[in-house]
């Protein structure tokens, strides 16, 4: 499974002005959906995405789009794992946020790769065991 982070969804669904090229992440996301790849969205990411919209129409548009993705909700064990991630990162001097630790925990517990543009997750990967979805570089998960 591939879990989507807010950074990817925000850029992919951002309205573009005429002639503006499609962001690479939007094209990759479209290819993942077309290939019927298992793609999910953490519940907290859905909340973050929808909390940033300005109009009820945009809220409804994004809600409709997001219904096409599996919703990944946190369980008790995910919260415990998130706390362990925060502690492991703190011991290494890596700053984290509670939300980012929960997103990482959800990816780890579902054996999913996290598709993100947020560099904080790259710093968290080694101490947490988080797998990041790669969009270039020749690996098997590349798109």
Q: Model segments located where?
A:
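Acidic, PIN/NYN-like endoribonuclease modules and their adjacent C-terminal/linker elements
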Residues: 1, 104, 108-143
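Short, well-structured N-terminal submotif of metal-dependent ribonuclease cores
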Residues: 1-41, 51-64, 134-143
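Generic structural signal for small/hydrophobic residues in well-ordered secondary structure
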Residues: 5-6, 49, 82, 107
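A generic structural signal for short hydrophobic patches within well-formed alpha-helices
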Residues: 9, 46-49, 121-122
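A general structural signal for well-ordered alpha-helical segments in protein cores
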Residues: 25-26, 46, 59-62, 79-82, ...
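Hydrophobic helix-cap positions at the C-terminus of alpha-helices
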Residues: 31-35, 85, 89, 124
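Structured helix-beta-strand junction loops
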Residues: 35-36, 65-69, 92, 110, ...
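Active-site neighborhoods of divalent-metal-dependent phosphate/nucleic-acid chemistry enzymes
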Residues: 70-117, 143
């Amino acid at each position: 499974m591939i879990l989507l982070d807010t950074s990817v969804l925000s850029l992919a669904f951002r309205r573009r002005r005429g002639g503006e090229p499609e962001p690479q992440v939007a094209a990759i996301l479209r290819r993942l959906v077309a290939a019927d790849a298992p793609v999910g969205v953490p519940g907290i990411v859905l909340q973050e995405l929808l909390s940033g919209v300005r109009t009820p129409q945009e809220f409804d548009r994004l809600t409709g789009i997001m219904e096409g993705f599996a919703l990944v909700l946190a369980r008790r064990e995910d919260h415990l794992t998130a706390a362990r991630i925060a502690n492991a990162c703190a011991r290494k001097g890596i700053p984290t946020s509670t939300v980012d630790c929960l997103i990482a925990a959800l990816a780890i517990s579902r054996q999913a790769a996290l598709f993100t543009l947020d560099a904080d997750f790259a710093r968290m990967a080694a101490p947490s065991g988080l797998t990041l979805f790669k969009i270039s570089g020749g690996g098997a998960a590349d798109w």
